[in-house]
């Protein structure tokens, strides 16, 4: 108890904030019908210039769909551009949209960021 109180007091005195670090992504999960549209949103770690969207199909490793550096696209060679679109707003938040969705789009979609 005493050690925890001391650490808490030290953090307060240093002016440090206890925050949740990491990439924020929503929705956590989404189930839709074929031919419907779906959009995913990502907020990268503060200060990270590079943002990635990955698709991971069951039983496979993650596949890079698109990579942004600030506002610009670095690599979108694996993005199926006929139905998938992605943008990065003001070098911060990003959206990934699938319209219309097909059965083969069933996957986990992951967002990551780096310096």
UniProtKB/Swiss-Prot annotation:
Its main location: membrane. Residues 1-21 form the signal peptide. InterPro entries: Ig-like_dom_sf, Ig-like_fold, Ig_V-set, TCR_beta_variable. It is found in: Cell membrane. Disulfide bonds join 42-111. Transmembrane segments: none annotated. Pfam families: V-set (PF07686). One of its GO terms (cellular component) is T cell receptor complex. Residues 22-115 form the Ig-like domain. One of its GO terms (biological process) is cell surface receptor signaling pathway. Keywords: Adaptive immunity, Cell membrane, Disulfide bond, Immunity, Immunoglobulin domain, Membrane, Receptor, Signal, T cell receptor. Alpha-beta TR is a heterodimer composed of an alpha and beta chain; disulfide-linked. The alpha-beta TR is associated with the transmembrane signaling CD3 coreceptor proteins to form the TR-CD3 (TcR or TCR). The assembly of alpha-beta TR heterodimers with CD3 occurs in the endoplasmic reticulum where a single alpha-beta TR heterodimer associates with one CD3D-CD3E heterodimer, one CD3G-CD3E heterodimer and one CD247 homodimer forming a stable octameric structure. CD3D-CD3E and CD3G-CD3E heterodimers preferentially associate with TR alpha and TR beta chains, respectively. V region of the variable domain of T cell receptor (TR) beta chain that participates in the antigen recognition. Alpha-beta T cell receptors are antigen specific receptors which are essential to the immune response and are present on the cell surface of T lymphocytes. Recognize peptide-major histocompatibility (MH) (pMH) complexes that are displayed by antigen presenting cells (APC), a prerequisite for efficient T cell adaptive immunity against pathogens. This is T cell receptor beta variable 11-2. The gene is TRBV11-2.
């Amino acid at each position: 108890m005493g050690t925890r109180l001391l650490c808490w007091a030290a953090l307060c005195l240093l002016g440090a904030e206890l925050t949740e670090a990491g990439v924020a992504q929503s929705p956590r999960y989404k189930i839709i019908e074929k031919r419907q549209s779906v959009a995913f949103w990502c907020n990268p770690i503060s200060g990270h210039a590079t943002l990635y969207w990955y698709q991971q199909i069951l039983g496979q490793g993650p596949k890079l769909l698109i990579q942004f550096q600030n506002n610009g696209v670095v690599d979108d060679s694996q993005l199926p551009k006929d139905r998938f679109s992605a943008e990065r707003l003001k070098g911060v938040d990003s959206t990934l949209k699938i319209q219309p969705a097909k059965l083969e789009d069933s996957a986990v979609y992951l967002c990551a960021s780096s310096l």
